[in-house]
């Protein structure tokens, strides 16, 4: 039987690239009175890409495009990104002067409220590379003889609603989404995007003067840790599966103490010193986990059950049924030892169950 064909995951465009495209389109509309159906803009790597645009009725020189994030599960995929070009307008709290234009954050674009990010507090949450892309795209449309400074306002009508599905509130970005991107391209399920978010969370925590960082594998694990820890919201970062990176990053940024909260499958992977805990990067080897538990003192009858288990949760159930809290503790100690070796900091381990309860602390 032939194997089923699996097409490669499709890349898409960042909100920053979309914002640059509609900014150029709005500038053309303002200058010529004609709305372009398509524009081509430069990307940071020197390549050029085309975007389909639509004029927005009754809003002046305003153009829009629908963000296509490809096969990446991006919350902004399918969102309408708008830009309005004008010569008028007073400076407001969400505007910033660039070299050639004045850039403003409109409805649905967040505003930075905390230190530690690449954008200063009070400015629109439009990151440095998107700002450069917007200015470069607009420059291609501006007349060389035009001396007045152009105002570009970026808006995302669904931005406030979409922001609730992001970590923006924790980063100190209020009232909307961020306009993001470093290359203009969205890579499906991008590791670099995950890591950048983790690092940004840690930067915000350090800028707030925090000495302790809580890294968790997901929202359930984070909720469990919050039951024991009296720390501000900025101290928490969901690292997903990027365990080794998060430990190294927390160590590099100088936190004195790291709290690692995870469910059993993730904790036992840490005990096995698996640096990236997603199932596609080394599915939990039941045999390896069972071998570790055997080494730690599981008896013959228990080992039979452990080696026959299909999942990590099933293994934990066997340990609980047999009253082997000592083995659970030993696994957490191994995970702690690994985490402290990687981070070179003091690490506390919190084993969380599916009800967001802490069932062991080390």
UniProtKB/Swiss-Prot annotation:
State the pathway, as annotated in the record.
Cofactor biosynthesis; adenosylcobalamin biosynthesis; cob(II)yrinate a,c-diamide from sirohydrochlorin (anaerobic route): step 6/10
* Presence of the UniProt keyword Methyltransferase in the record: yes
Reactions that this protein is recorded to catalyse = Co-precorrin-5B + S-adenosyl-L-methionine = Co-precorrin-6A + S-adenosyl-L-homocysteine
Example GO BP: methylation
One Pfam family it belongs to: CbiD
Q: What is its EC number?
A: 2.1.1.195
Coiled-coil region list: none
**Swiss-Prot/TrEMBL keywords:** Cobalamin biosynthesis, Methyltransferase, S-adenosyl-L-methionine, Transferase
Q: GO MF terms on file?
A: cobalt-precorrin-5B C1-methyltransferase activity
Kindly indicate whether the keyword S-adenosyl-L-methionine belongs to this entry: yes
Family, as annotated: Belongs to the CbiD family.
User: What protein is this chain from?
Assistant: Cobalt-precorrin-5B C(1)-methyltransferase
Q: What is the lineage of its organism?
A: Bacteria, Pseudomonadati, Thermodesulfobacteriota, Desulfobulbia, Desulfobulbales
């Amino acid at each position: 039987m032939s194997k089923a064909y699996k097409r490669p995951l499709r890349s898409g465009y960042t909100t920053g690239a979309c914002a640059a495209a509609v900014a150029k389109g709005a500038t053309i509309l303002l200058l010529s009175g004609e709305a372009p159906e398509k524009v081509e803009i430069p990307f940071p790597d020197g390549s050029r890409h085309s975007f389909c645009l639509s004029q927005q009725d009754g809003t002046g020189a305003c153009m829009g495009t629908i963000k296509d994030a490809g096969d990446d599960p991006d919350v902004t995929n399918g969102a309408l990104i708008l830009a309005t070009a004008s010569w008028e307008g007073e400076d407001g709290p969400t505007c910033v002067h660039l070299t050639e234009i004045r850039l403003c954050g409109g409805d649905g674009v967040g505003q930075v409220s905390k230190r530690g990010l690449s954008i200063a507090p009070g400015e629109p949450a439009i990151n440095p590379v998107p700002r450069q892309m917007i200015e470069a795209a607009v420059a291609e449309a501006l007349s060389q003889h035009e001396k007045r400074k152009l105002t570009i306002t970026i808006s995302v009508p669904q931005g406030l609603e979409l922001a609730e599905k992001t970590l923006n509130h924790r980063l100190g970005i209020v009232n909307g989404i961020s306009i993001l991107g470093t290359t203009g391209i969205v890579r499906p399920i991008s590791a670099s995007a995950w890591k950048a978010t983790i690092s940004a969370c840690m930067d915000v925590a350090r800028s707030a003067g925090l000495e302790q960082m809580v890294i968790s594998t997901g929202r359930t694990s984070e909720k469990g840790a919050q039951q024991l820890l009296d720390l501000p919201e900025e101290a928490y970062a969901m690292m997903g599966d990027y365990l080794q990176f998060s430990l190294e990053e927390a160590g590099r940024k100088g936190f004195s103490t790291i709290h690692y909260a995870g469910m059993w499958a993730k904790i036992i992977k840490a005990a096995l010193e698996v640096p990236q805990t997603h199932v596609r990067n080394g599915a939990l080897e039941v045999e390896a986990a069972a071998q570790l538990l055997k080494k730690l003192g599981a008896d013959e009858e228990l080992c039979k059950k452990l080696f026959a288990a299909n999942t990590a949760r099933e293994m934990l159930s066997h340990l609980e049924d047999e009253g082997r809290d000592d083995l659970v503790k030993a696994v957490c100690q191994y995970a702690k030892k690994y985490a402290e070796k990687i981070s070179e900091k003091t690490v506390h381990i919190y084993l969380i169950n599916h009800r967001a309860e802490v069932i062991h602390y080390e």
